[in-house]
Amino acid sequence: MTNNTKSITLNLGPQHPATHGVLRLILEMDGEVVNNADPHIGLLHRGTEKLIEHKTYLQAIPYFDRLDYVSPMCQEHAFALAAESLLECEIPRRAQFIRVLFSELTRILNHTLNIGSQALDVGATTPLLWLFEEREKIMEFYERVSGSRMHSNYFRPGGVAEDLPDGLLEDIDKFIQQFPPKLQDIENLLNENRLWKQRLVDIGVVSQKEAMDWGFSGPMLRGSGIAWDLRKSNPYDVYAEMDFEVPIGKNGDCYDRYLVRMLEMYESVKIIKQCIEKMPQGPVKTDDPKLTPPTRAKMKESMEAMIHHFKLYTEGYDVPAGEIYKAVEAPKGEFGVYLYSTGGNRPYRCRIKAPGFAHLQGLDFMSKGHLMADVITIIATLDIVFGEIDR
């Protein structure tokens, strides 16, 4: 008896809910076994890098919120650090603590969505519902600090837009007290679940060499056992003062990457707790008048202050000529911004390095030899968002 399987080509997406965006995947399969996976990108391309060249440094910030729209503040952070390096301005301590605090809240925001939607992709509904309750609380913190639940536009070259409103730190403290037990509930539900492990263990295995060769970063790299985290290896703002661990996996499969993301949330809680305990008093913006607009009280007294405010928001400020690359440890991996300034009020070039772009390239070799159903698991573990991939 012969076992002949038919070779088929399948278009997966871009309207499929499990592709996490507008991914079009062309799968070449023998029966249900995948031979090749060819991702087609560009369906969400908006020309972000070119648009930024026509905006002032202040007007460019909202574009970063719309790249990886699941973790917006981390991307603003990279751009702010790059602009600050060219400007050579001092950042107030309180602003640095606030930025680290919200970067870690953003990490939790990202990982809760990833783990919840990954569980949903393989057939578990409960984790998504539980984790979305926690995400809602963080989005309320976003709204209270910036006025927006998603596209916050909060970080600025020189600090942050506004100081924390009264009572917010206390509410964040309450949140991190009750959040770890909720994570423990998710772990009790998934970690030793037979079906969950069957769907994730030994699926999409990435060796240390492959992770390095393909330029992986974040949980995709640490899941393979490489302890590389920019918060430790190249600390920015006040990360050097924070006490936290870098979780790593050992097998490089989907299950290890899930565990790394779970453990990262516990570490984020530790960092947030330290930020709240050590939060200093003081200004949240640099005192350089070229970067910081005058207060409303000053504008009511002085015509020059009103003119200064108007010119700052219409013409922006000149950034000294030079080039810089700055990267942050975003929830998905290394998010980098390369800025080239010719001395004007607009960047001559702004190149964005998105971690998801490198991770999506690895989908082909990770999928080979797996079943069609496993491709869905691998897409989920890549944690891709097409805002940052297509830009």
Swiss-Prot record:
One of its GO terms (cellular component) is plasma membrane. Its EC number is 7.1.1.-. It is found in: Cell inner membrane. It is an enzyme of class 7 (translocase). Keywords: Cell inner membrane, Cell membrane, Membrane, NAD, Quinone, Translocase, Transport, Ubiquinone. It comes from the Bacteria. Pfam families: Complex1_49kDa. It catalyses: a quinone + NADH + 5 H(+)(in) = a quinol + NAD(+) + 4 H(+)(out). GO terms for molecular function: NAD binding; NADH:ubiquinone reductase (non-electrogenic) activity; quinone binding. The keyword Transcription does not apply. NDH-1 is composed of 14 different subunits. Subunits NuoB, C, D, E, F, and G constitute the peripheral sector of the complex. NDH-1 shuttles electrons from NADH, via FMN and iron-sulfur (Fe-S) centers, to quinones in the respiratory chain. The immediate electron acceptor for the enzyme in this species is believed to be ubiquinone. Couples the redox reaction to proton translocation (for every two electrons transferred, four hydrogen ions are translocated across the cytoplasmic membrane), and thus conserves the redox energy in a proton gradient. NCBIfam families: NuoD, PRK06075.1. Belongs to the complex I 49 kDa subunit family. This is NADH-quinone oxidoreductase subunit D. It comes from Rickettsia bellii (strain OSU 85-389).
